[in-house]
């Protein structure tokens, strides 16, 4: 802190009791105990090249090779499925030379499903085992590299940390952040992704990024999304996909692109599961369990997670009022307090294969969150010579309860994997929020009067989403993707303020109370054509969209309707320079729609002198993004260089007015305004390194320049800034059972309109010890060992300058225990597990 007199102070902390942790741990362990009898009946995962116990005289053998270089692909997963009902019969993992041999098969018709991280899954033709010919040679099975699969990559293993494709980078969660306890900590370790002290996620320095869960946009945003990611257990994440320039098939929201968090959905064999328990010296606790089961046509996955996170916070808000450049008066605000966050997260999914071609899926997500925030701010009013005029305290005590339920049902018909498919999905989401805040002002030996204020916000949001997608191959190397997506959202919020300005104990409704409603509808159709010829891969698409919103204020009767039509073209060209090198060029148009709080013009006070004001006249902002990329992949790792350029119109920017007046108070207001244009360009340099089994690492460097123009003579709102960030993450396997991991991230200072953000840094170091083979592990992690995590911003003009700084408890020791049982999961996504190629109508039975 700038002033050493600030001391941490804890007020009404939301501390977790031993009983709360024991209850959550008991629930996770109960899941384990219930599944233990079944797990005992589930065969263990076999080592590479091994086969299941003999059940018949048949066998299938073959080799897995790279589709372009014919080099062996070791460690690929081979699943043997029945031709009759697609049920899983047996499985194996290819040896280092790509060979496999699966024995003990009864006479019958089968097919193979072969998958490997960084390659497109491959389905074989029908293989028939008969008493007369029990041995079947599947021959070489060629896998196409993910780098030429424009539809994306399916991660099916954990042996590589990163897979590179023209449109996205895919990071295996367990490899990138082996010591992480929640999704937010996993994202901190992903190159090009930043997570600040408040949990806000950004991509290449841009916070306007869409976070998806299993390919679907998260229905929550802002602080609620940050809280949710901190409650999502890390062991439920399979991989993270970073898509900086999505195609027209994807939703166009997110100016910086898309971060897709793929959760574990189901497993390939029998039953598997796990339990995670974690605790830290900083009052942070986690308990979670997951269970997956596959039998015949049905696949079920369940997970539960509990978190509790209590932190102390310190900070300052210093205001200097100026007259002709000379100090006129000072206000010094010292903040100390505590915050607590906790919640429960449940995720369940069921996939049922109706036939060889048709799959019905259903998913349910329930998230319950609660938080507390208690703080005391000490204000000192000083004159120009820094003589004390007045001193008082502002006490803040708030509680928040949030609940979200998300249900999805989908159908998919596959005639040829990724070549001829039809899918439909419906989704309903409901969120409820109840926030309560009390504010008190008390004199400290001065002349100030005592006052009090009680705020309560109750909000309900419903969203209905429908989507239909159709894929059809047009020849051997060309594919057409087309579809429709629409959603409707209804948001109602009641904001009640009761004020006691004289401190008499009599509260009355304030003029700051208001009720608002936001109705929003979006309908879109898209078409994407992709194909290849020789070393070239091409993709072009167009998305047409019509959107409308109506923002209304019940207290004033005002309505702010706004409707607009948009076109979102996209394109991608990639060229393979050789077996290991590739060039790409991509383009897409993106949109950012203003959120509810950004539109709400009624003031919301953080404290006595800081207020939040929305702008109901905001327009959406559009960004045209171009990216050039070079990728080099080799046995020991990969290197990726990606220069990019973004041009944004109607830029939505946070405007900090240090000399505003609201409800008769002199305040610093935070609002939003559309600026004229914004340009940003820069480059990403990311690399991965793998030195056998001893060492693996990731490193990234990002530099970008941002220029905004206020337009209309608002030169004071313009900015011109250059900033950069760097990240390194390495894992050293000291022994086959012990691994040491260290990570460091640094973001340089950055200019904004009327101000400047200071630098931000974060470090983590951990050691992980395997127990009981690979079934269990114990991890010890030290977070922020140098105590560098803090937020600092300076903003102002010729009249007022304000310095704000915040820091919370971040340096801590974490201990995590994980136990897995049953089959080691080879995770697959329902949209990628396809039956063997068939012919026929996509609408047939």
Predicted regions and their residues:
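Surface-exposed extracellular loop regions of Gram-negative outer-membrane beta-barrel proteins
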Residues: 432, 548, 579-624, 645-670, ...
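Short, acidic Ser/Thr/Gly-rich low-complexity loop/linker segments typical of extracellular
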Residues: 83-99
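N-terminal periplasmic accessory domains that precede
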Residues: 140-141, 183-186, 225-228, 254-275
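Transmembrane beta-barrel wall of Gram-negative outer-membrane proteins
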Residues: 279-314, 327-375, 399-407, 413, ...
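Short, acidic, small-residue-rich periplasmic hinge/interaction motif at the N-terminus
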Residues: 43-52, 65-71, 77-81, 115-117, ...
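Face-selective signature of the C-terminal outer-membrane beta-barrel domain
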Residues: 345-369, 394-552, 641, 679-704
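Outer membrane beta-barrel strand-and-loop segments of large Gram-negative receptors
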Residues: 334, 453-455, 463-467, 507-516, ...
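Short acidic/polar hinge/loop motifs at secondary-structure boundaries
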Residues: 189, 216-244
């Amino acid at each position: 802190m700038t002033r050493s007199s600030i001391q941490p102070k804890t007020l009404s902390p939301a501390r977790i009791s031993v009983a709360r942790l024991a209850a959550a741990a008991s629930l996770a362990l109960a899941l384990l105990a219930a599944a233990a009898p079944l797990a005992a009946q589930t065969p263990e995962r076999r080592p590479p090249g091994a086969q299941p116990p003999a059940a018949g005289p048949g066998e299938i053998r073959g080799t897995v090779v790279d589709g372009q270089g014919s080099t062996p692909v070791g460690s690929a997963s081979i699943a043997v499925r029945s031709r009759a009902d697609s049920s899983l019969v047996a499985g194996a993992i290819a040896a280092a030379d790509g060979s496999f041999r699966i024995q003990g098969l009864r006479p019958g018709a089968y097919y193979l499903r072969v998958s490997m991280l960084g390659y497109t899954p491959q389905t074989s033709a029908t293989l028939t085992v008969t008493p007369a010919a029990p041995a079947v040679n599947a021959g070489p099975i060629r896998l196409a590299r993910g780098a030429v699969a424009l539809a994306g990559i399916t991660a099916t293993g954990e042996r590589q940390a990163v897979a590179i494709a023209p449109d996205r980078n895919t990071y295996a969660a367990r490899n990138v952040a082996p010591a992480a306890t929640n999704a937010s900590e996993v994202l901190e370790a992903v190159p090009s992704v930043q997570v600040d002290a408040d949990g806000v996620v950004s991509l290449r320095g841009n916070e306007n990024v869409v976070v998806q869960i299993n390919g679907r946009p998260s229905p929550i945003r802002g602080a609620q999304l940050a809280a949710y990611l901190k409650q999502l257990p890390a062991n439920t994440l399979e991989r993270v996909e970073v898509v900086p320039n999505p195609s027209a098939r994807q939703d166009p929201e997110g100016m910086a692109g898309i971060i897709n968090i793929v959760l574990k959905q189901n497993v390939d064999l029998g039953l598997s599961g796990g339990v995670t328990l974690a605790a830290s010296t900083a009052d942070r606790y986690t308990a979670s369990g997951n269970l997956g089961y596959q039998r015949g046509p049905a696949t079920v996955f369940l997970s539960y997670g509990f978190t509790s996170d209590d932190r102390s916070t310190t900070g300052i808000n210093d205001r200097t009022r100026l007259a002709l450049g000379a100090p006129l008066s000072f206000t010094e605000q010292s903040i100390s307090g505590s915050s607590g966050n906790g919640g429960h997260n449940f995720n369940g999914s069921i996939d049922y294969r109706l036939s060889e071609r048709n799959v019905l899926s259903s998913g349910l997500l329930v998230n319950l969150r609660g938080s507390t925030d208690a703080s005391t701010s000490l204000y000192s009013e000083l004159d120009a010579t820094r003589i004390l005029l007045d001193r008082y305290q502002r006490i803040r005590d708030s509680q928040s309860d949030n609940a979200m339920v998300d249900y999805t049902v989908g159908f998919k018909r596959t005639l040829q994997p990724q070549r001829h498919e039809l899918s439909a999905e419906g989704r309903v989401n409901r969120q409820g929020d109840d926030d309560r805040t009390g504010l008190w002002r008390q004199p400290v030996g001065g002349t100030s009067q005592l006052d009090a204020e009680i705020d309560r916000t109750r909000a309900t949001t419903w969203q209905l989403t429908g989507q239909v997608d159709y894929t059809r191959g047009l020849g051997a190397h060309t594919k057409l993707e087309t579809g429709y997506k629409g959603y409707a959202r209804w948001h109602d919020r009641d904001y009640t303020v009761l004020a006691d300005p004289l401190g008499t104990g009599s509260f009355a409704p304030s003029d700051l109370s208001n009720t608002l409603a936001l109705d929003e509808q979006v309908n879109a159709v898209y078409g994407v054509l992709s194909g290849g010829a020789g070393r070239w891969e091409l993709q072009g698409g167009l998305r047409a969209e019509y959107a409308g919103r109506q923002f209304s204020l019940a207290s004033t009767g005002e309505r702010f309707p706004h409707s607009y039509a948009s076109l979102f073209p996209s394109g991608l060209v990639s060229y393979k320079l050789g077996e290991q090198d590739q060039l790409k060029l991509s383009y897409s148009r993106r949109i950012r729609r203003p959120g509810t709080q950004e539109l709400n013009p009624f003031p919301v006070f953080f404290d006595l002198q800081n207020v939040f004001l929305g702008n109901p006249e905001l327009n959406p902002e559009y960004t045209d993004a171009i990216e050039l990329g070079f990728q080099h992949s080799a046995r020991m790792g990969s290197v990726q260089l990606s220069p990019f350029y973004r041009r944004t119109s109607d830029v939505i920017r946070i405007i900090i007015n240090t000399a505003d007046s609201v409800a008769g108070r002199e305040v610093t207001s935070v609002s939003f305004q559309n600026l004229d244009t914004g340009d940003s360009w820069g480059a990403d340099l990311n690399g991965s390194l793998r030195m056998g089994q001893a060492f693996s690492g990731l490193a990234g460097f990002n530099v970008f320049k941002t220029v905004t123009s206020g337009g209309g003579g608002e030169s004071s709102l313009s900015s011109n800034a250059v900033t950069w960030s760097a990240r390194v993450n390495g894992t050293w396997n000291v022994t086959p059972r012990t691994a040491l991991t260290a990570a460091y991230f640094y973001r340089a200072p950055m200019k904004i309109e009327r101000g400047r953000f200071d630098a931000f840094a974060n470090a983590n170091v951990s050691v992980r010890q395997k127990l009981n083979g690979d079934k269990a592990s114990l991890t010890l992690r030290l977070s922020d060992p140098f105590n560098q995590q803090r937020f600092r911003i300076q903003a102002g003009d010729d009249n007022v300058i304000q310095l704000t700084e915040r820091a919370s408890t971040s340096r801590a020791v974490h201990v995590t225990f994980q136990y897995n049982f049953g089959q080691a999961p080879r995770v697959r996504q329902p949209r990628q597990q396809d039956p063997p190629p068939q012919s026929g109508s996509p609408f047939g039975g």
